[in-house]
Amino acid sequence: MEHEDLERMEKGIYTEGFFNLTDDNIYKSKVIKDIDTNIGQLLKTDAKFYAIHVSPSEKELLAMGNSEQEQAQAMKRYIREVFIPEYAKNFNKELSASDIKFYGKIHFDRSRSKNKQNMHCHLIVSRKDQANKKKLSPLTNHKDTKNGVIKGGFDRVNLFQQAEQGFDKLFDYNRQQSESFNYHNTMKNSSIPKQIELQEQKIYGEKKKETFQSDEKYNKIFCNLASKQDNKYPYNLQNSNDSLLSIF
């Protein structure tokens, strides 16, 4: 990430600093210190933070603005107003966005991408809440648990759905069925008859609009959650390039 920033600054090109829920242009040293010290009661085997990658498609980026600066400001608005609030809600612990300690960094290039539009956002989200009291893991398999030692949980599918719907509402984006998380999740995990039914619905919708897009890549917002302990990626829900939202 630093390599891209240095190249852009040397060329006098617009560059974004770190941001959180309320502030912009935060120094890297503050980010490191804040995350490294927010580890109360964590075990040595626990991850200190999770890395989340939000990567809109070219079509989605065009809905966010015409210039890199416009798209970057729109991305920060999306993270602050949609993604982090939904992330907090999905723990089912009555948390709000202000309870989540995170830092974001926006970048504009991808080394292996041939797209003209490549803006994306890296989020670093602390394992502990803002008060350094509650452990929060988006990789837990518990979902809204009411009884037992573990209360709450995390519903990743619901997060993806809400993050997608929030994006569409915020940017007035007209998402086609074949672009949706539900479509790709069903195509990946459902029975053959259900997959055929969805394919038929997709084809019917395309014919109705007199548009054929089967040779184009599906639009996608990648949301990659990774435990940054030992640089391992322990959880893999779906890793298809055609999926709207993926966790690694």
Language-model features, listed with the residues they occupy:
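N-terminal nicking endonuclease/strand-transfer module with a His-rich metal-binding environment
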Residues: M1-F248
